[in-house]
Amino acid sequence: MSDINATRLPGMEPPSPMPCVGDADNFTLTRG
């Protein structure tokens, strides 16, 4: 899921502080 986060939010830091939140947001946006 690192690639998704990096592609979605390149400006934000890597998924360390809140990987779940980032993943969820990306999943929701990607899935719809």
Curated annotation (Swiss-Prot):
Task: Provide the gene name from the record.
Answer: MSD11
Q: Which residues form the propeptide?
A: 1-10, 20-32
What is the source species? Amanita bisporigera (Destroying angel)
Q: Where is this cross-link: Cyclopeptide (Gly-Pro)?
A: G11-P19
Q: Give GO MF terms, alphabetically.
A: toxin activity
Task: Classify the source by domain of life.
Answer: Eukaryota
> Looking at the record, which segments are called Disordered?
1-32
- Write the protein's name: MSDIN-like toxin proprotein 11
Quote the PTM field: Processed by the macrocyclase-peptidase enzyme POPB to yield a toxic cyclic nonapeptide. POPB first removes 10 residues from the N-terminus. Conformational trapping of the remaining peptide forces the enzyme to release this intermediate rather than proceed to macrocyclization. The enzyme rebinds the remaining peptide in a different conformation and catalyzes macrocyclization of the N-terminal 9 residues.
